[in-house]
Design a protein with these regions (language model features):
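Flexible coil/loop and intrinsically disordered linker positions at secondary-structure junctions
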Residues: 5-169
Length: 169
């Protein structure tokens, strides 16, 4: 009985395939597209890093970053402000991922920026790796952060000096 039923189902399936004419046009036509909503323009300042850094603190950090040579180029306060707003007109190139991770980790520990800073940098493609010219990923930044927790990177004392100055206000 089961065999007959199985044969019956197979015949139905074969009949349904044979009875449906293939129309080339029907395959190419996309299904009804839903109207894409216009992107909503949000006014105000974007703050993905949840930065609470003041203009004076940004200037101090610029000195720190330039003295420690965290990036391959010298930066100015406008660049760092744009970095924290994820509105860079280009990208920064890391000179030392471990130093960058150490700085960002310290800023996060003292609640100057969000704990999720790695995702913000990766998702917004803000920094290129020094050697491979590819954007730093969350994984790259996570590895660098884990590494600096065990072995301080060369130049960490420069960052610590400026972090202490930040805390003094």
């Amino acid at each position: 009985m089961q065999t007959q039923y199985l044969e019956y189902l197979q015949q139905l399936e074969n009949a349904s395939h044979a009875s449906v004419p293939l129309d080339e046009k029907s395959e190419e036509q996309p299904k009804e597209e839903k109207a894409q909503p216009e992107p909503t323009k949000i006014v105000g300042k974007s703050n993905p890093f949840k930065s609470v850094l003041t203009t004076q603190q940004i200037k101090l950090l610029v000195e720190c970053i330039n003295e420690a040579h965290i990036f391959t180029t010298t930066i100015i306060p406008k660049i760092l402000s744009d970095f924290f707003a994820c509105k860079l007109n280009g990208v920064l190139k890391s000179n030392n991922n471990r130093l960058l991770a150490y700085l960002m980790m310290q800023l996060s520990c003292y609640n100057y920026i969000a704990y999720e800073w790695q995702s913000v940098i990766a998702n917004n493609k803000l920094v290129l790796a020094k050697i491979k010219d590819k954007y730093l990923t969350r994984s790259d930044l996570s590895s660098a952060t884990d590494n600096v927790k065990c072995i301080y990177p060369k130049g960490y004392e420069i960052i610590d000096k400026y972090i202490k100055q930040l805390q003094k206000g």
